[in-house]
């Protein structure tokens, strides 16, 4: 038995003509009976068979015939007179069909020759190896289950238009193995996180997606209207305040993996709809959180990829090494050593320097900014993108951390960290502020900033203050950006690569 070289006929005809021809074939199928049958049940998947029989040679398969029923999308077809081959792809991988008129009947064979790439087909038969050693199904029954009306992209060029890959992700998944691998890794990552949290005795919960008051983060919300209650509502920007209400209620370890929505810009790192994991643990602080977060990310990499050493954009990254820890000013002086302690403590100098670096210091967020906020802005301009290796930036100023517990020893500083890897923020956590009077005062300060024009400043949440007044135990809480973590683990340069259906402008 000789196999032809695996090639795909060049598609010369106009796509509309191809679609018209396929619709004609579908009409003929309808005339024959059920065009889209749903009575075939596979017994095996391609990857399962490839793994199970990887060591079985041609003679072993002939001596022990193994019957299978397999279905999938036809990706290649080679018709050679009285013997033909088809490569069929299911959700796990690919396997080859071997088709002859003697085995499936002349009528079925003639029909098969008219089937198109992209059609969903099914076969029953026995496994064997071809002369080239490829595991194949020698078909004794062959059926067309679903007619594809649109042609797949050319095999050798694939789906080259990046926006089209995002807009028609279903096609991208069909023709691009790397895309399928990315989303399998995403699923493994989330499964690993869930197991890690469960093993640490955290309870998974679900909190509201519609909020009467947006809170838990500094962000601009999406606004909607609840018709039955006749009230303005907001898609949640963060679940934090609800999760901490649960800590008050006595659930001492909780987490949630879900969507947040922020009506802000789109960039390689930002999508208005994104997935976060937030967790809260009573009787912990931000140092415990850093240790826990480091272990969680390391384990997620091992579970998703089989190793803690990864490649990201051509550079190696070892997540098994201890993560670095720096304060904001330490990071600035490490990556921009020209700045002196005196300059970093000079409000006027920092404003002038930020302006020189292109930051608009006249925007509302900078109106009454103190040293801490200005230092943070300088850090973002000079050091953040340099944090390639995992680094916890610690001890954030109170004025930019309205929900974090203040340090007992350093005035103006909170027990807060942000984790950066490859220059991107991956996590944000802190010892929680559980003093209701301090929290109320910080909310009032946020309201003043909002009234001054800062759209991202927080609202005053009276019910959350009431919850704190019942007493919240000392608590640590952290949020991890799932999308950015998956970007890291899958070597994806943009967040759109790890979202199945990213937001795009309306199609013309």
Swiss-Prot record:
Annotated Mg(2+) 1 binding sites: 418, 425
Reaction it catalyzes: tRNA(Lys) + L-lysine + ATP = L-lysyl-tRNA(Lys) + AMP + diphosphate
A cellular component annotation (GO) from this entry: cytosol
Pfam family, one: tRNA-synt_2
InterPro entries: Aa-tRNA-synt_II, aa-tRNA-synth_II, aa-tRNA-synth_II/BPL/LPL, Lys-tRNA-ligase_II, Lys-tRNA-ligase_II_N, Lys-tRNA-synth_II_C, NA-bd_OB-fold, NA-bd_OB_tRNA
Cofactor(s) needed for function: Mg(2+)
GO MF annotation terms: ATP binding; lysine-tRNA ligase activity; magnesium ion binding; tRNA binding
Cofactor note: Binds 3 Mg(2+) ions per subunit.
Listed EC numbers: 6.1.1.6
GO BP, sorted A to Z: lysyl-tRNA aminoacylation
Residues reported in the UniProt entry to bind Mg(2+) 2: 425
UniProt KW keywords: Aminoacyl-tRNA synthetase, ATP-binding, Cytoplasm, Ligase, Magnesium, Metal-binding, Nucleotide-binding, Protein biosynthesis
Subcellular location(s) per record: Cytoplasm
Family the UniProt entry places it in: Belongs to the class-II aminoacyl-tRNA synthetase family.
Subunit organization: Homodimer.
Protein name, as recorded: Lysine--tRNA ligase
Organism this protein belongs to: Burkholderia multivorans (strain ATCC 17616 / 249)
């Amino acid at each position: 038995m000789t196999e032809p070289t695996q090639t795909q006929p060049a598609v010369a005809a106009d796509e509309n003509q191809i679609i018209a021809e396929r619709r004609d074939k579908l009409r003929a199928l309808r005339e024959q009976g059920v065009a889209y049958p749903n009575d075939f049940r596979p017994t095996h998947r391609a990857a399962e068979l490839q793994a199970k029989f990887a060591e079985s040679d041609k003679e072993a398969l002939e001596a022990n015939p193994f019957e299978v029923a397999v279905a999938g999308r036809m990706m290649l077809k080679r018709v050679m007179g009285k013997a033909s081959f088809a490569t069929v792809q299911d959700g796990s991988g690919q396997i080859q069909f071997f088709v002859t008129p003697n085995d499936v009947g002349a009528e079925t064979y003639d029909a098969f020759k008219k089937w198109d790439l992209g059609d969903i087909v099914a076969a029953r038969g026995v496994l064997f190896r071809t002369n080239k050693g490829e595991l194949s199904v020698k078909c004794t029954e062959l059926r067309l289950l679903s007619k594809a009306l649109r042609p797949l992209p050319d095999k050798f060029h694939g789906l080259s238009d990046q926006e089209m890959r995002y807009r028609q992700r279903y096609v991208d998944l069909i023709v691009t193995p790397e895309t399928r691998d990315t989303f399998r890794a995403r699923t493994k990552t989330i499964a690993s996180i869930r197991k890690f949290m469960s093993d640490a005795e955290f309870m998974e919960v679900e909190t509201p997606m519609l909020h009467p008051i947006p809170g838990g983060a500094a962000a601009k919300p999406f606004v909607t209207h609840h018709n039955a209650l006749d009230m303005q509502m907001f898609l949640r920007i963060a679940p934090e305040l609800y999760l901490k209400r649960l800590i008050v209620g006595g659930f001492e370890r909780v987490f949630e993996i879900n969507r947040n929505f922020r009506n802000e810009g789109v960039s390689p790192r930002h999508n208005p709809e994104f997935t976060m994991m937030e967790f809260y643990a009573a009787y912990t602080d931000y140092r415990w959180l850093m240790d826990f977060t480091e272990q969680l990310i390391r384990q997620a990499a091992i579970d998703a990829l089989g190793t803690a050493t990864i490649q990201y954009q051509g550079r190696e990254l070892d997540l098994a090494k201890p993560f670095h820890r720096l304060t904001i000013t330490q990071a600035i002086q490490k990556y921009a050593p020209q700045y002196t302690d005196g300059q970093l403590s000079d409000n006027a100098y920092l404003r002038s320097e930020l302006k020189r670096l292109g930051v608009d210091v006249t925007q509302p967020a900078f109106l009454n900014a103190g040293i801490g906020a200005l230092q943070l802005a300088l850090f973002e301009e000079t050091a953040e993108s340099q944090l390639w290796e995992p680094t916890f930036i610690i001890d954030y100023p109170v004025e930019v951390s309205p929900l974090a517990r203040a340090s007992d020893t350093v005035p103006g500083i909170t027990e807060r960290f942000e984790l950066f890897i490859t220059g991107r923020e991956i996590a944000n956590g802190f010892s929680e502020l559980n003093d209701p009077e301090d929290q109320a005062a910080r909310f009032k300060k946020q309201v003043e900033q909002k009234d001054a024009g800062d759209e991202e400043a927080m609202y005053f949440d009276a019910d959350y203050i009431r919850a704190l007044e019942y007493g919240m135990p000392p608590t640590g809480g952290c949020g991890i950006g799932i999308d950015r973590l998956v970007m890291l683990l899958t070597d994806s340069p943009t967040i759109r690569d790890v979202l199945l259906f990213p937001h795009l402008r309306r199609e013309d």
